[in-house]
């Protein structure tokens, strides 16, 4: 196999794995006789990392707040090359949010393969940019919410909020506690978002979606995202959420080194389901899109391997760049790039094997194959 190590395409190399970590990448002909060898065909790359996954395998995190539910979601996405993800819990009651965090605490303690932490998307968002989120559950952030958001002692916690609704002090407190804070479902103006970035805002959830568009005299959240160098942007590259031209413009403005592919996947990923229920509303799966009856997008019918293929085929990006957007760049955003996102000595053996059409042949998490 060719090896993409996170920076370069390498030929004629072996990847040596011991105790779930990468030991080295020696020339294949230099392998000692005592090493158990497996020959694989295709392209071996760092496993994909997806920071926005609402569900998969028929399970929606909001509905199934259990370790087994989390395990099902992770397993469904693993089939598409995702070796690390943040199961994502969207706007809901305080009680169910606490249950989701507790289930994640248990899943992390149980070392469920592929689970890196939790993404809490809402409920501290803008009602006017709610998208498919239930307005009945949108609310201001209180002290008891901060306790839930900072409850996890291991793994990553990512919170998507509207900075104009929460204020800068809450963002600074979350960031100081190690929580990753993203702006999303926001109607905040440019100045508010830039100031939030100075107070610890780390990124932007599904850039362009659920936020005002960039305008000449009012750049808004999109302008702030593209004009703040040390922030990261999640991109849904499915041909439905954002036009290909708008994605290319964003990458031309900010570069790809702070752009990460996300799926925003729902329960249908990895299944042949034609729809599902979300807070009592039916979501329909048609022509690669998930929508309510009135046509509102409700997450995406996307997996990471498809996002990689779309980025190469639709956006015309080079494969090394795209593979970084699917692995190393999200690892950096999560502050896990010391052990994820590269095939290098000391890194976790989280790997994906792709065929020539960029479909997934096999994955490894901590050196264990699926």
PLM regions: where:
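Conserved, mostly hydrophobic/aromatic
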Residues: 120, 174, 204, 311, ...
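N-terminal metal-binding scaffold of metallo-dependent hydrolase/deaminase domains
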Residues: 1-32, 364, 369
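Charged helix-capping and loop-helix junction motifs
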Residues: 67-68, 100-103, 142-144, 216-222
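His/Asp/Glu-enriched, well-ordered alpha-helical/loop segment
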Residues: 223-233, 251-263, 269-347, 351-354
């Amino acid at each position: 196999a060719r090896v993409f190590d996170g920076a370069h395409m390498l030929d004629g190399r072996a990847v040596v794995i011991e105790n779930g970590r990468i030991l080295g990448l020696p020339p294949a002909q230099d392998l000692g006789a005592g090493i158990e060898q497996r020959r694989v065909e295709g392209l071996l790359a760092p496993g994909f990392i997806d920071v926005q996954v609402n569900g998969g395998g028929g399970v929606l995190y909001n509905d199934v707040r259990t370790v087994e539910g989390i395990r099902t979601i992770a397993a469904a996405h693993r089939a598409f090359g995702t070796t690390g993800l943040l199961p994502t819990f969207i706007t809901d009651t305080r009680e169910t949010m606490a249950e989701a965090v507790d289930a994640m605490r248990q899943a992390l303690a149980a070392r469920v393969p592929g689970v890196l932490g939790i993404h809490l998307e809402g409920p501290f968002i803008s009602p006017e940019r709610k998208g498919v989120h239930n307005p009945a559950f949108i609310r201001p952030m209180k002290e008891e919410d901060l306790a839930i958001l900072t409850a996890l002692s291991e793994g990553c916690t990512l919170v998507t909020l509207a900075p104009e609704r929460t204020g800068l002090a809450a963002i600074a407190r979350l960031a100081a506690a190690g929580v990753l804070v993203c702006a999303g479902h926001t109607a905040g103006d440019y100045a508010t978002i830039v100031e939030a970035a100075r107070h610890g805002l780390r990124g932007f959830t599904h850039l362009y979606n659920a936020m005002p568009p960039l305008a000449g005299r009012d750049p808004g959240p999109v302008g702030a995202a593209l004009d703040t160098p040390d922030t990261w942007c999640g991109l849904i590259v499915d041909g439905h959420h954002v036009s290909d031209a708008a994605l290319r413009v964003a990458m031309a403005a900010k570069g790809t080194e702070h752009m990460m592919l996300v799926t925003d996947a729902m329960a249908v990923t990895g299944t042949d389901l034609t729809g599902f229920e979300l807070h009592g509303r039916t979501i329909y799966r048609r022509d690669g899109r998930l929508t309510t009856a009135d046509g509102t997008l409700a997450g995406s019918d996307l997996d990471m391997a498809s996002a990689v293929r779309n980025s190469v085929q639709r956006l015309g990006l080079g494969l090394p760049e795209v593979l970084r957007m699917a692995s190393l760049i999200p690892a950096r955003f999560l502050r896990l790039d010391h052990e994820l996102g590269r095939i290098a000595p000391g890194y976790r053996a989280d790997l994906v094997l792709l065929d020539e059409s960029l479909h997934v042949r096999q994955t490894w998490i901590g050196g264990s194959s699926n």
